[in-house]
Regions:
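Cell-envelope/extracellular polymer assembly enzymes that use nucleotide-activated donors
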Residues: 47-49, 79
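Long helical/loop segments within the catalytic core of UDP-sugar-dependent glycosyltransferases
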Residues: 20-24, 114-138, 169-241, 245, ...
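A conserved acidic beta->alpha catalytic loop
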Residues: 84-94, 117-119
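Catalytic donor/gating beta->alpha subdomain of glycosyltransferases that bind UDP-sugars
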Residues: 170-209, 236-239, 244-307, 395-398
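Membrane-embedded multi-pass helical conduit in multi-pass membrane proteins
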Residues: 42, 306-387
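Short, acidic, metal-binding catalytic loop of nucleotide-sugar glycosyltransferases
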Residues: 66-77
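Acidic donor-binding/catalytic loop of UDP-sugar-dependent glycosyltransferases
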Residues: 90, 152-169
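N-terminal membrane-anchoring/stem segments of glycan-assembly enzymes
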Residues: 1-44, 201, 209, 213
Length: 398
């Protein structure tokens, strides 16, 4: 009986992996993609404020600012605001040092903003407080519909052509007669440490399936998704939905903001931006564990069935097939089923390499990545539900 059950589970894993490969090609392989604009035209924008909310980002901030300051001239006045949320490491000093290096050079106006303590009696999560304070700075005179507010994370890296490309897109990127009010880009995910290689390729595939771009871009579909590391708002739309203040207590604020944009009748445009922006989310297992246990349960709407279901899908699809290989010594068909499933895992990674340039590194450790995600999910449910250990960079989210 046990052999039969394993055969059935293995066949389900094969079917699920094959379906995943097909859906990835249909939803991401053919998704709208934004790249450098070789022939930029006139802009509708009159001003751009680029905001980097930071808290203890000494390992990221210099490279982030270097990339921003290396941007091609966007063709309009712009400013760079680093909104420091009370960093206790070297972040502030590094920002000041970087800003002083080329003060006489061209580029944006630069400002390091100390956002001060969060209001007593109010719940502010994550980067919502520094983001809201940077957005509330004085704006130049002019129509707010022509002014833009770009939020990027400190672990994001802009390519030199990124700002020009996105401003050109919002100038001409119209669908169904609606102007773009929020442009968000899915970045190219980069991995460094082993923990990232185990988890991030699997998570990227799940996100691609769970948040289809086509539905997010459909004005009449309620589906709304935004990639928090890169969100470009039309100022008038941002203020109309209440900005980050309206989602102050949300841990996954990007989804809340995207939902508010669509619910208010504004236009959301979600594109693949892998040729323009790169993101490395975590530096080690500890930060990866903290990050995904913070977000996973919220990402499935605090639904325990979806959460446990996602864990079972990952463990069944990526870990079980490797267990079937040695069991092939007992039953040859078990080993064959395991080989087919592992071949499909490799096919998914090959697809990711062809479409997005993701290296095949450590693909054979997918079983370990599946087990790690299988542990992340119940930990995320526990942390989010009880508040115990639910932190980001050491700050409690409860």
């Amino acid at each position: 009986m046990a052999i039969l059950v394993l055969k059935v589970l293995g066949l389900i894993a094969c079917l699920g992996l094959a379906l995943m490969l097909l859906l990835l090609e249909l939803q991401l392989g053919r998704a709208p993609r934004l790249g450098p604009n070789p022939d930029p035209g006139p802009l509708e924008a009159s001003f751009l404020r680029l905001v980097v909310p930071v808290y203890n980002e000494e390992n990221n901030i210099v490279a982030c600012l270097d990339a921003v300051l290396a941007s091609q001239d966007p063709g309009l006045p712009w400013e760079l605001v680093v909104a420091d949320d009370g960093s206790t490491d070297a972040t502030e000093g590094l920002v000041n040092e970087r800003f002083q290096v080329d003060q006489a050079g061209t580029g944006p106006a630069r400002r390091l903003l100390d956002v001060g303590p969060r209001p007593e009696g109010e719940r502010w999560c994550g980067k919502n407080w520094p983001a809201s304070q940077a957005a509330a700075l004085d704006w130049p005179a002019g129509d707010p519909r022509g002014q833009w507010l770009l939020f990027i994370d400190a672990d994001l890296r802009l390519e030199p052509a990124a700002l020009v490309a996105v401003l050109q897109e919002v100038a001409g990127g119209r669908a169904e007669g609606l102007p773009v009010d929020l442009l968000t880009l899915a970045p190219r995910l980069e991995c460094g440490c082993l923990a990232e290689w185990l988890v991030q390729p699997i998570v990227a595939s799940l996100l691609g399936l769970g948040f289809p771009l086509k539905r997010s871009n459909d004005p009449v579909d309620a589906t709304a998704f935004a990639a928090g590391p890169f969100m470009l708002f039309r100022r008038s739309a941002y203020e109309a939905i209440g900005g980050h203040r309206a989602v102050a207590g949300e841990v996954v604020e990007d989804l809340a903001l995207a939902g508010a944009i669509k619910a208010s009748g504004h236009r959301l445009l979600y594109l693949l931006g892998i040729d323009l922006v790169r993101l490395r989310m975590y530096r080690d297992l500890e930060s990866l564990w903290e990050g995904w246990t913070k977000n996973w349960y919220l990402g499935v709407d605090r639904n325990p069935f979806k959460a446990i279901g996602s864990a079972l899908v990952v463990v069944g699809g990526f870990s079980l097939p490797w267990l079937l290989l040695p069991l092939g010594l007992l039953d040859r068909s078990l080993g064959l089923i395991g080989l087919v499933a592992i071949g499909l895992q490799l096919a998914i990674r090959f697809w990711s390499r062809i479409r997005f340039g993701t290296p095949l590194r450590y693909w054979w450790l997918a079983w370990l990545g599946g087990l790690l995600i299988g542990a992340i999910v119940p930990a995320s449910i526990w942390k989010t539900t009880t508040g115990q250990g639910w932190t980001w960079r050491g700050r409690s989210l409860a």
